[in-house]
């Protein structure tokens, strides 16, 4: 994407991945009500401009709706899967204060994020074999230096079970 428009750095992958708010799984919808004019809503405008793209990138399952100039005071409303609503007043707050507050009340804590990251890394460990959906490799024959799969290249006679059974039977006689 070309670096054109207002503050194009907001669309870079590095900037988007720097966001640190990952919502809990119960958050389904986030609405932002703010005004485009006035001093009291300056933090909300900066929050929408700088931080909403990061939140969208980190939380693709959350629907985010923006309402401009429909309210006297800026606020955020979160709809949870249990039917509850969480209302956050953002009047006179800066965009950083808003991010910290939202992270504190509806964000996952560091321990949960660390545990989820560990589980993802464990699933993608190169020693695991299985369907491509879950593992990096389907068969041991895909590892360099291993014996190729008998489905692709036939095994030498000495390694087959029939040959070894015949050898044992001949030794017993």
From Swiss-Prot:
Pfam families annotated for this entry?
Answer: L51_S25_CI-B8
- Report the InterPro entries cross-referenced here: Ribosomal_mL43/mS25/NADH_DH, Ribosomal_mS25/mL61, Thioredoxin-like_sf
Q: Where is the protein localized? A: Mitochondrion
Complex and partners: Component of the mitochondrial ribosome small subunit (28S) which comprises a 12S rRNA and about 30 distinct proteins.
| Any one GO MF annotation of this record | structural constituent of ribosome
Highest taxon listed in the record's lineage: Eukaryota
Q: Which UniProt keywords apply?
A: Mitochondrion, Ribonucleoprotein, Ribosomal protein
Q: Which SUPFAM superfamilies match?
A: Thioredoxin-like
Q: List the disulfide bonds.
A: none
Family statement: Belongs to the mitochondrion-specific ribosomal protein mS25 family.
Q: What is this protein called?
A: Small ribosomal subunit protein mS25
* Protein's gene: MRPS25
Source organism per UniProt: Bos taurus (Bovine)
| SMART domains the UniProt entry points to | L51_S25_CI-B8
